[in-house]
Amino acid sequence: MFSVNIRKTDSTHEINIADEGQGMSQVLPIVTRCCMSDDKDTLIVVEQPELHLHPAAHEAIADLLADTAKVNNHRYVIETHSKNLLLEIRSIVANKNYSLTKDDVVVYYIHDDEECNAILDRIDIDENGNMSDWPEEIFNESFELIKKIRRNAN
């Protein structure tokens, strides 16, 4: 029998992952896969990496995905319902200190038409983190993250 213990970077206290929330045990395989290096470009599909995690952790996941995309030769397809994850990706694109650029990111908004057919609308992110043609009814954006996008764009 075995157990998996985790600890925060700034702590010596270890916690059994079974004693953490469900989100931690669900995100651990994603984090592990993201940190694995590949010789060739690898496509990794991730469904709702933010599931069962605190909203602040959504930003950390976005940072991890951005950091590992080029370093580990990964391309990601991410399905998410997290406005924080998307806002952080926008912030990263606007941040000139990151290697992730507007050309590296594509967003698709999927919705149904009148006949219940799935429609994919491409939404581009510009170099300042702004999104083209975003539906007004989706995601009431957090004021603090919008300020961060503006700061990083300058």
Task: List where the protein language model places each region.
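Switch/communication elements of ASCE P-loop NTPase nucleotide-binding domains
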Residues: 1-151
